A protein has these predicted regions:
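Conserved short alpha-helical segments that host acidic/polar catalytic motifs at enzyme active sites
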Residues: 1-177
Length: 177
């Protein structure tokens, strides 16, 4: 289980992102993460914390001042450490997912055969958010890449992408996650 939150504002989005992500705390107990994009410095800022021994608020409140920007995404996840930040031919982006992918091992082997690599291992397993990001960057643009994800995965996936231009939200046709 898990839940995510995204926001775009004309002023700093940090407080909205913090409280919006915290609102999803009942959906997961393992990890929480937030990422913002600061257009002024052209930087993505990210933080991920383990929530198994403490609450989201406790883990993130002290470090809120480091987040800058008018757009951001956050997640409460029972699976992978997220968000992850990718630099690709599509541009830089942060991604969070809530997913249950039945054919993850098959897709992992296909991507490895294409000379792709996985850097975000989680408990010795492939981070499904990174796998989804690698499927996205196979597209000619974000829309084509997201369509590639939904053509290839067996299961369910909802996602938020934080790009330099804003937020892209997508879910599978069944909307199960």
């Amino acid at each position: 289980m898990g839940g995510f939150f995204g926001t775009v504002a004309k002023v700093s989005c940090t407080a909205d992102l913090f409280y919006g992500t915290d609102y999803n705390s009942h959906l997961g107990t393992k990890r929480g993460g937030m990422a913002t994009y600061d257009a002024e410095s052209k930087q993505f800022l990210r933080s991920i914390h383990n929530l198994e021994s403490s609450y989201f608020r406790t883990k993130f409140e002290e470090g809120l001042s480091k987040f800058k920007g008018c757009s951001g995404i956050g997640i409460i996840s029972d699976t992978d450490p997220q968000p992850i930040i990718i630099n690709s031919h599509l541009g830089r982006f942060a991604i969070v997912t809530v997913a249950k992918i039945a054919n993850i091992e098959e897709l992992e082997q296909e991507l490895l055969a294409q000379n792709m690599h996985f850097a975000e291992l989680s408990s010795g397993k492939t981070n499904q958010t990174e796998l989804i990001a690698l499927l996205i960057i196979q597209g000619k643009d974000f829309v084509d890449g997201i369509e590639n994800v939904y053509r290839r995965i067996k299961g369910s996936c909802s996602m938020l992408l934080l790009t330099e231009d804003g937020i892209i939200a997508a879910r599978d046709k069944w909307g199960r996650t």
